Amino acid sequence: MNYHVMTLFPDMIHQAMNTSIIGRAMEKGLLTINAIDIREFSEDKHRRVDDYPYGGGAGMVMAPGPVYRTYEHVMKMIDHNKEMLAQDKTMKIPEESVSERKNETRRPRVIYLTPQGKVFHQKMAEEFAKEDDLVFLCGHYEGIDERVLDQIVTDYVSIGDYILTGGELPVMVMMDAISRLIPGVLNNNASAEFESLQDNLLEYPQYTRPEVFMEQKVPDVLLSGHHANIEKWRREQSIIRTLKNRPELLEEAVLSKKEKQFLEQLRLGEDSKNV
């Protein structure tokens, strides 16, 4: 996976993402993060990238020119990398099919972080994780000139119904969530498959040593060594937690027949309490 972030604050991206799991994944060559400074593509001698909004109003608007030139630079960089990769593949695998090469010419997705976008969720992360390149555009001030957005953006995405200073923090949230789904990024690949929000359920409670803490004991089933019972308990706890905290997720939850019956019993119990 190659991330390309068009931003006014490239150091913010590099410093934050060069640590922990993401940093180790970059060291392994599993992903790259290129933060491109939009100011570098300003034609103003002071590297200015914003201007007053037509029609008046508070604040400033990011001008279309520097953003579009940054986009062109990123596209050329991606094309160059693909050409180099294609040449390497041709040397190693002469029989590569024409259809595979055509797929590689598809333009990468350009994601603009905005409160007006679709709310980011796990299934969206899974979809984005299938891409070879993802381009992110970070807005600032009162936003970006609509004309350049119309030209380059493929996906409008939000991380929630609130306002942040810029797009950098949402981009880092997205890159973290997406990267966890790339094979090899997590030390235990099963972690990405079975952690919170898998099957549209919240994660079950976790426990570690000591066995007793502040007079609270680890549930006996987790000490039993009976893997089938442990798995059943965990699924039931996930259903209980989801019903309590995020009931809307249950509409698309993947449940077995017995789990659906368990959920129905929980709901009946909740209804009886409210009578």
UniProtKB/Swiss-Prot annotation:
Homodimer. Its EC number is 2.1.1.228. The keyword Transferase applies. GO terms for biological process: tRNA N1-guanine methylation. S-adenosyl-L-methionine binds at residues 139, 159-164. Specifically methylates guanosine-37 in various tRNAs. GO terms for molecular function: tRNA (guanine(37)-N1)-methyltransferase activity. Keywords: Cytoplasm, Methyltransferase, S-adenosyl-L-methionine, Transferase, tRNA processing. CDD domains: TrmD-like (cd18080). It is found in: Cytoplasm. Pfam families: tRNA_m1G_MT. Belongs to the RNA methyltransferase TrmD family. GO terms for cellular component: cytosol. Transmembrane segments: none annotated. It comes from the Bacteria. This is tRNA (guanine-N(1)-)-methyltransferase. Its main location: cytoplasm. InterPro entries: Alpha/beta_knot_MTases, tRNA_m1G_MeTrfase_C_sf, tRNA_m1G_MeTrfase_TrmD, tRNA_m1G_MTases_N, tRNA_MeTrfase_TRMD/TRM10. It comes from Lachnoclostridium phytofermentans (strain ATCC 700394 / DSM 18823 / ISDg) (Clostridium phytofermentans). It catalyses: guanosine(37) in tRNA + S-adenosyl-L-methionine = N(1)-methylguanosine(37) in tRNA + S-adenosyl-L-homocysteine + H(+). PANTHER family: TRNA (GUANINE-N(1)-)-METHYLTRANSFERASE. Coiled coil: none annotated. The gene is trmD. The keyword Ubl conjugation does not apply.
